[in-house]
């Protein structure tokens, strides 16, 4: 409407206003929701849980799983409620004994220097926190006051023990150690020993080792059974291998973990075109081991979607020997280079080995035959002008 009146030029009219409502509208395919995020968090929302009381049966685990603000709020309210509760008890004891009556009393009070609820509240804090100012004290006049003193001390010790244990468990949780276990941002598929392999790189930034480290991998995809049952998250275990074979790894330096795509692999019919079309595929990698310093089992997780798998790439070397020891350049941790790789599935490669022979023949031509050019006649491929240096 504004463009018709000449207020907004015609070329600045929004596309949404200019499109024909009778024409069908197309939109890009939405990206598949992750089952496990890149940082290892499970992308699952639990809804309509009826038996909420099950969480209260394990109060300690519930407190540890809560976020820090909620945990601190619960402990703060626990201290305040216990102080107020016992302050009311001390005030009632003083009121029943007549210690709150005005005037100089000839009888010995149950608790000295308690004249109001405020003084009873201060005495409750002094008893539970064991401050010991010395202005108020329990006398031998009331046995009930002695019993309440013992009960409040026990309650205070229990709250302190639970709070310290919860804080210790939250600060020493296993996932804190997993923050320094890193995975490559992309996974690659390339030839290794004449077979197509799915490869990724894993590393540990700390010097303290992960003992008995093992790595597992699962493929998660949406499948339909022959009976018509739709399984939205069908999980299939696939074997992972390293340089020494098996799932156990010695994670001192970054390692390239690979999976040989053979006839038993769920990636046997996966080709480069499937990756480009964002196939409904997610590969979850789980690294698990025991922390050397604490003895706690830790687990690091990540996942790779179809568009995060690079076909025909290989990781660059990052470990070098310098001054009698090995050094790791983490700036190249996720860097890859293109390598000759058949543009077919592992199934097609097993059926037609000529694809691999043709690829090997093509890769041996050209780069190995290097023309020798005399140094004196060699021409520079580029030159640096004085303007470029300024």
From Swiss-Prot:
Binding residue positions for ATP: 48, 50, 330
Record-listed a 1,2-diacyl-sn-glycero-3-phospho-(1D-myo-inositol-4,5-bisphosphate) binding positions: 176
Gene3D superfamilies associated with the record: 1.10.287.70, G protein-activated inward rectifier potassium channel 1
Gene Ontology CC entries for this record: cytoplasm; inward rectifying potassium channel; T-tubule
Intramembrane segments: 117-133
Taxonomy, superkingdom: Eukaryota
Cystine pairings recorded for this chain: 110-142
Sequence positions bearing Phosphoserine: 385
Chemical reaction(s) catalysed: K(+)(in) = K(+)(out)
Motif (Selectivity filter): 130-135
Pfam families: IRK (PF01007), IRK_C (PF17655)
Topology in the lipid bilayer: Multi-pass membrane protein
Binding site for K(+) 2: 133
Family (UniProt): Belongs to the inward rectifier-type potassium channel (TC 1.A.2.1) family. KCNJ11 subfamily.
Role played: Inward rectifier potassium channel that forms the pore of ATP-sensitive potassium channels (KATP), regulating potassium permeability as a function of cytoplasmic ATP and ADP concentrations in many different cells. Inward rectifier potassium channels are characterized by a greater tendency to allow potassium to flow into the cell rather than out of it. Their voltage dependence is regulated by the concentration of extracellular potassium; as external potassium is raised, the voltage range of the channel opening shifts to more positive voltages.
PANTHER family per record: ATP-SENSITIVE INWARD RECTIFIER POTASSIUM CHANNEL 11, INWARD RECTIFIER POTASSIUM CHANNEL
Protein name: ATP-sensitive inward rectifier potassium channel 11
Source organism of this protein record: Cavia porcellus (Guinea pig)
Gene from which the chain derives: KCNJ11
């Amino acid at each position: 409407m504004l463009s018709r009146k000449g207020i907004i030029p015609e070329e600045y009219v929004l596309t949404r206003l200019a499109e024909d409502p009778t024409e069908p509208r197309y939109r890009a395919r939405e990206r598949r929701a992750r089952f496990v995020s890149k940082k290892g968090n499970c992308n699952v929302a639990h809804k309509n849980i009826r038996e909420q009381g099950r969480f209260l049966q394990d109060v300690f685990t519930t407190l540890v799983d809560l976020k820090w603000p909620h945990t601190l709020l619960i402990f703060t309210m626990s201290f305040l409620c216990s102080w107020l509760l016992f302050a009311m008890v001390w005030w009632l004891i003083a009121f029943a004994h007549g210690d709150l009556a005005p005037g100089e009393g000839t009888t010995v009070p149950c608790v000295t220097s308690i004249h109001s609820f405020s003084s009873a509240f201060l005495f409750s804090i002094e008893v539970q926190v064991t401050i010991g100012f010395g202005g108020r004290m329990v006398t031998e006049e009331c046995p009930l006051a002695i019993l309440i003193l013992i009960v409040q001390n026990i309650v205070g010790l229990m709250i302190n023990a639970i709070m310290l244990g919860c804080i210790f468990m939250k600060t020493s949780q296993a996932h804190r150690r997993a923050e320094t276990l890193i995975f490559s941002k992309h996974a690659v598929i390339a030839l290794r020993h004449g077979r197509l392999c799915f490869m990724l790189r894993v590393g540990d930034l700390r010097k303290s080792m992960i003992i008995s480290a093992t790595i597992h991998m699962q493929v998660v995809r949406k499948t339909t059974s022959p009976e018509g049952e739709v399984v939205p998250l069908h999980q299939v275990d696939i074997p992972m291998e390293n340089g020494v074979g098996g799932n156990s790894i010695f994670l001192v330096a970054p390692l390239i973990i690979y999976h040989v795509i053979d006839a038993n692999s769920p990636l046997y019919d996966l080709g480069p075109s499937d990756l480009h079309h964002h196939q409904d595929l997610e590969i979850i990698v789980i690294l698990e081991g025991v922390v050397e310093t604490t003895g706690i089992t830790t687990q690091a997780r990540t996942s790779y979607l179809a568009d995060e798998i690079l076909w025909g790439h290989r990781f660059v070397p990052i470990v070098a020997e310098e001054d009698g020891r090995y050094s790791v350049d983490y700036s190249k941790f996720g860097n890859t280079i293109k390598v000759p790789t058949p543009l077919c599935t592992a199934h097609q490669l097993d059926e037609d080995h000529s694809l691999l022979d043709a690829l090997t023949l093509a890769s041996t031509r050209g780069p190995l035959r290097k023309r020798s050019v005399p140094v004196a006649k060699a021409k520079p491929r580029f030159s640096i002008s004085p303007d470029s240096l300024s």
